């Protein structure tokens, strides 16, 4: 692992919260807050990948770098792969970190945590998880659960991802956080694969990698970043970031 690249896919076509990346939070667009958190992680260059000129202009006005991608990508991973080839056609970056564009309050430290397990050459992809502490989350299908076993301090090997409560019995349940660090070769392989049977059934793209025999490990973090999906989430993010600004 030599020189990671951080990519933030962003597009306007959100159903529950229209124009989400451009929503104002404490005087700046949400996508700018995400870009700033990724820069603060200090692991490598940060680029926003978008199919919307207004998003690109907003990021660039804040001092960031954005690239335009096609509008017809079936998934964020495909957008990621196109952006990687635009930004780094020479292949200098051998790791790409995918930070979702709706995490304006994310702790930069957990972005950095995602690349650590890639020191193990048998790992293809790394993601994050946090312990489920709210019993209502265990049965909530909107909370994706990671099923895995420990392979070291603060690290799990993912065996499955599901919207159901799993695994059964006593023990921790893990809330999956949709941030990924890919080896470049793994990302290329992943986007070339057809959708998997379990991926389609659970509506979870990461299952495609497991079905194909790729290894996904997860770094355990203490806190869940706030994902902004609804107007209520947006108000929570505004309160949090306005409070930080006042402090």
Curated annotation (Swiss-Prot):
MF (Gene Ontology) = 3-deoxy-manno-octulosonate cytidylyltransferase activity
Q: Which UniProt keywords apply?
A: Cytoplasm, Lipopolysaccharide biosynthesis, Nucleotidyltransferase, Transferase
Q: In which pathway does it act?
A: Nucleotide-sugar biosynthesis; CMP-3-deoxy-D-manno-octulosonate biosynthesis; CMP-3-deoxy-D-manno-octulosonate from 3-deoxy-D-manno-octulosonate and CTP: step 1/1; Bacterial outer membrane biogenesis; lipopolysaccharide biosynthesis
Query: Entry's SUPFAM superfamilies?
Result: Nucleotide-diphospho-sugar transferases
As for subcellular location, the record says: Cytoplasm
Which InterPro entries does this entry report, sorted A to Z?
Answer: Cytidylyl_trans, KdsB, Nucleotide-diphossugar_trans
Biological processes per GO annotation: CMP-keto-3-deoxy-D-manno-octulosonic acid biosynthetic process; lipopolysaccharide biosynthetic process
Q: What is its main location?
A: cytoplasm
Naming one, the record's GO cellular component terms include:
cytosol
| PANTHER family named in the record | 3-DEOXY-MANNO-OCTULOSONATE CYTIDYLYLTRANSFERASE (PTHR42866), 3-DEOXY-MANNO-OCTULOSONATE CYTIDYLYLTRANSFERASE, MITOCHONDRIAL (PTHR42866:SF2)
Name this polypeptide is given: 3-deoxy-manno-octulosonate cytidylyltransferase
Record gene name: kdsB
